């Protein structure tokens, strides 16, 4: 399953340089998936000599991410992330690891989570950094941070290749963009010496998730691309068990947990689930910092 926004922009994997995108090629890929309406929407996008207009695509992606922020606000992504990274930070402090601690948001988009954390969970020993390949999204994140007078930073780069690497890696709504076969490589990248912990929040697949996504995006999103991609996100989300196996196999230095598979005291699936990991040497301190919530942490094997 494909999302339109995943196809509108491409980068050279070796250099990170942006590459031209052929409009007809991505429309054909969508048609091959049976997504006629999505292909038609792509065919209407401005192009020069058959190649998508980069400036238009950048403006479109910023607009889409502005709409995505509505989802982030309603699902309290900022507060949700703060509640999950705070125990890891406290465990690092308790163990004697000295700050500043660098929290890096992978695929930050326009930086909602980083900006929320900077505004509501600021600490002298914590740095919040948002990273995204798309320079237009990074510029918009920087503009919004300046407007809010926030002390955080944003970088157009590979989150795993930063000059000042992360101590805690986080993301929201990113895991489902990776094919299942690439999840192992993603988690293997967490094995860098500097990485102490991670928190990745994403949609949880279920029979009712596509319907819920359709209702939400029909009522909250104006852009057709936002509506289409939102439903696709719910449809292509990975099962927590699959994510758990990838993390346990490819990030063996970490104690890995899943949180939030079921609504409390019911068999109903949560809309979002969280994958959490810390170095094994910090596992006891982290579970202690979670307090009573530690009972809800399910080990991943």
Describe the predicted segments one by one.
Residues 1-54:
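N-terminal auxiliary segments of SAM/dcSAM-dependent transferases
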Residues 58-84, 88-92:
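Class I SAM-dependent methyltransferase Rossmann-like catalytic core
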Residues 104, 110-158:
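Class I SAM-dependent methyltransferase SAM/SAH-binding core
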Residues 170:
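A conserved beta-strand element that flanks and buttresses the S-adenosyl-L-methionine
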Residues 178-190:
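A short, conserved alpha-helix within the catalytic core of class I
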Residues 194-204:
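Conserved beta-strand signature within the Rossmann-like core of class I S-adenosyl-L-methionine
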Residues 203-251:
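C-terminal alpha-helical "lid/dimerization" subdomain adjacent to the S-adenosyl-L-methionine
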Residues 249-301:
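Conserved Class I S-adenosyl-L-methionine
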């Amino acid at each position: 399953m494909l999302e339109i926004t995943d196809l509108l922009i491409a980068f050279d994997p070796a250099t990170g340089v942006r590459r031209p995108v052929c409009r007809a090629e991505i429309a054909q890929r969508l048609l091959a998936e049976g997504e006629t309406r999505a292909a038609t929407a792509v065919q209407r996008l401005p192009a020069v000599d058959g190649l998508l207009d980069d400036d238009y695509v950048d403006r479109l992606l910023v607009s889409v991410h502005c709409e995505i922020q509505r989802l982030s606000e309603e699902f309290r992504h900022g507060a949700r992330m703060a509640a999950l990274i705070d125990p890891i930070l406290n465990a690092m402090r308790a163990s004697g690891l000295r700050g500043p601690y660098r929290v890096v948001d992978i695929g930050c988009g326009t930086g909602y989570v980083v900006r929320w954390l900077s505004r509501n969970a600021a600490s002298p020993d914590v740095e919040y950094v948002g990273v995204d390949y798309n320079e237009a999204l990074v510029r918009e994140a920087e503009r919004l941070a300046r407007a809010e007078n926030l002390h955080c930073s944003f970088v157009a780069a590979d989150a795993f290749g930063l000059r000042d690497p992360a101590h805690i890696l986080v993301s929201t709504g990113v895991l489902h963009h990776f094919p299942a076969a690439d999840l192992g490589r993603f988690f293997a990248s967490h094995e860098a010496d500097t990485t102490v912990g991670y928190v990745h929040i994403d949609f949880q697949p279920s029979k009712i998730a596509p319907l819920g996504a359709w209702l939400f995006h029909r009522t909250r999103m104006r852009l057709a691309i936002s509506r289409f991609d939102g439903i696709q996100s719910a449809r292509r989300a990975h099962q927590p068990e699959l994510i758990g196996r990838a993390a346990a196999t490819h990030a063996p230095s970490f104690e890995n947990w899943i949180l939030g598979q079921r609504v409390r005291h019911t068999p109903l699936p949560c809309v979002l689930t969280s994958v959490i990991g810390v170095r094994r040497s910090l596992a006891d301190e982290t579970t202690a910092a979670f307090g009573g919530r530690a009972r809800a942490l399910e080990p991943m094997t």
